[in-house]
């Protein structure tokens, strides 16, 4: 992916989800985050199941932002997001992450078409 997206990754065997968030942030950004908070879930159907993404926020960190094998890292102000190339559903992801009345971002397939639902 050549545009802007959020850091992400996977949970390793035996690792807690929170520990995976802390590890992935360190690996991808160079930042050590404290007290990540689960703020939403994104899910979509795959072959015989579904893929689930846990969305976290963290407001405390130490370290300096660095680039990694994942790409060049930059801070982007929320007001500037509309002027940069982002993943197509970044606005909806941020909406779920920042709106206390939302907790789920779901893709469903209806009549052969992908549909986005925010709950």
Over which residues does each language-model region extend?
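A short coil-to-beta-strand element that immediately follows conserved catalytic motifs
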Residues: 32-40
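Short connector loops at helix/strand junctions that flank enzyme active sites
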Residues: 6, 33, 49-53
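NUDIX/MutT-family hydrolases
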Residues: 66-97, 115-119
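Active-site-adjacent beta-strand/loop module that shapes the phosphate/pyrophosphate-binding cleft
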Residues: 44-64, 91-97, 101
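Conserved Nudix-box catalytic region and its N-terminal flanking loop in Nudix hydrolases
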Residues: 1-26, 112-119
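C-terminal regulatory/oligomerization modules of transcriptional regulators
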Residues: 99-119
């Amino acid at each position: 992916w050549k545009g802007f997206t959020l850091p992400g990754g996977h949970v390793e065997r035996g690792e807690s989800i929170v520990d995976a968030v802390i590890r992935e942030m360190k690996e991808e950004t160079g930042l050590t985050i404290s007290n990540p908070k689960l703020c939403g879930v994104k899910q979509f159907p795959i072959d015989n199941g579904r893929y689930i993404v846990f969305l976290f926020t963290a407001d405390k960190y130490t370290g300096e932002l660095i680039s990694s094998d994942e790409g060049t890292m930059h801070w982007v102000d929320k007001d500037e997001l509309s002027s940069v190339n982002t993943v197509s559903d970044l606005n909806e992801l941020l909406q779920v992450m920042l709106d206390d009345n939302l907790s789920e971002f779901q893709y469903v397939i209806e009549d052969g078409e992908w549909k986005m639902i925010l709950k």
